[in-house]
């Protein structure tokens, strides 16, 4: 089973789509919300240079955003 950690922010449609995709693919999902679960400074330390949401970790690897998650989960055998 894949483990997905999604760093999200309020009112982020792509964040919600990433969560829905991961759940549909039966992944274990940790959905973290900025301001509740982490601070912006913590995000910048974890993902230097990140400018978009969501930021996603798949099985311990920083993969980027929704497009990367979609590609990786869709290409699984």
Residue ranges of model-derived segments:
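Local sequence-structure signature of Cys/Sec-based thiol-disulfide redox active-site neighborhoods
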Residues: 1-27
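Conserved residues at beta->alpha junctions
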Residues: 9, 34, 60
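Short alpha-helical
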Residues: 13, 38, 64
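Thiol-based oxidoreductase modules, predominantly thioredoxin-like and allied folds used
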Residues: 28-40
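Short amphipathic alpha-helix with an adjacent loop that forms part of the alpha/beta core around
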Residues: 41-47, 73-76
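Structural micro-motif
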Residues: 47-57, 66-67
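Non-catalytic, surface beta->alpha helical segment in thiol-disulfide oxidoreductase systems
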Residues: 58-77
